[in-house]
Structures are given as structure tokens and as C-alpha cells.
């Protein structure tokens, strides 16, 4: 049985989550679909990467993770499959993968091109890619390999003087705890 995780900025009030799950189950009726979160702030790939980073390694190897945050397919932004740390990440080439780890590099990145010219939503493309992988398909058949993904580099910590450090709040949890850039390596900050 396949395990597919979903993480999005859809929210929980509309029908997008049901649509995504319906599409997945239509392709892979025995899939185990796990919701990581659908409450990511709209278009916030930094928050999405933080949540993904804290959760993905707890899943079995070869789990397929669909991250639909800021994932509009356009000429400027490709949809990709990244084989990273023995997991598959299906998302947009928007800097998300670069935020998962500085130490671990992706084994392979594929720009999804099997549906060029298809104006379907990104979730339809993600589902087709996930189904291909789950059925044992080689990710090379989904498109073309890309060597360099977009990198997100705006989270640098800056020291202005001996007593001032500037950083960024990455995530605010349900208890009001703030995670900021200098905490990023600390797993249990609150």
C-alpha cells in the first residue's frame, strides 16, 4: 500500500482537499493519504518547508509527499519531482526544496513535462506524477532532469552589532511559540 502525504495552503473550508483526495483515490484506490497540514499561510513556502522538514523523515522510505503551496504552473515556474533523502517530493520549483536541508542534496530532480500544454490545475499534474511513481514508474519518464533548482536565500541571519541579531520568524505554532531563523536547527524549541 502506498503512502502519500498532502501539505497545502488550501485551508479547510473549501472543496480543494476533497478534490485532491478524490483525484488520488481515483488513480490509486488503495493509497493511504495522510494530511500533514492544509493550514499553511497562503503562498508561504518557508512555513511549508519547516512543517515538511519536521515531519517527512518519520514516514517510511519512498513515501510520496505532495506539497501544493505556491505551485501555480507557469512559464516562470515548473512543477517538479525531487527524489530527496529516499523520499519523493512533488511540488513547484519555487525554492521549497532548497529549504529542506543544507546538508542533504537531492538525488534527482525532474521537471514534469509529460503534460506540456495541459492547463490543468497543479494538483491534477501532481496526482498523475504520484500515480506513476507509486506504480513503479521511473521518474525520468515524467519529464527532463534539471540540475539546478531555484534556491530560496532570503533567510540569512544578520549581525548588526555585538548585541543585535536580525532574523526572520519562520513559523508560529498553535501555542504562540515563534520559530525564527536562529532556531531552525533546533528541533524542539518550545
What is each of the regions a protein language model found here?
Residues 54-56, 78-80, 100, 155-159, ...:
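A generic local secondary-structure boundary/capping motif
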Residues 117-179:
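Anionic-ligand-binding alpha/beta catalytic cores of soluble enzymes and soluble regulatory domains
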Amino acid at each position: 500500500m502506498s503512502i502519500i502525504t498532502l501539505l497545502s495552503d488550501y485551508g479547510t473550508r473549501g472543496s480543494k482537499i476533497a478534490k485532491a483526495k478524490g483525484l488520488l483515490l481515483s488513480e490509486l484506490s488503495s493509497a493511504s493519504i495522510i494530511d500533514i497540514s492544509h493550514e499553511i499561510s497562503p503562498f508561504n513556502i518557508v512555513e511549508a518547508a519547516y512543517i515538511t522538514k519536521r515531519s517527512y523523515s518519520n514516514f517510511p522510505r519512498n513515501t510520496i509527499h505532495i506539497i501544493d503551496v505556491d505551485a501555480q504552473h507557469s512559464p516562470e515556474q515548473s512543477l517538479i519531482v525531487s527524489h530527496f533523502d529516499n523520499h519523493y517530493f512533488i511540488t513547484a520549483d519555487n525554492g521549497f526544496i532548497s529549504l529542506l536541508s543544507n546538508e542533504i542534496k537531492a538525488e534527482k530532480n525532474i521537471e514534469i513535462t509529460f503534460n506540456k500544454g495541459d492547463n490543468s490545475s497543479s494538483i491534477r499534474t501532481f496526482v498523475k506524477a504520484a500515480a506513476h511513481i507509486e506504480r513503479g514508474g521511473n521518474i525520468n519518464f515524467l519529464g527532463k532532469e534539471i540540475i539546478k533548482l531555484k534556491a530560496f536565500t532570503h533567510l540569512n541571519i544578520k549581525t548588526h552589532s555585538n548585541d543585535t541579531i536580525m532574523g526572520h520568524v519562520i513559523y508560529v505554532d498553535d501555542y504562540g511559540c515563534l520559530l525564527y531563523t536562529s532556531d531552525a536547527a533546533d528541533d524542539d524549541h518550545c
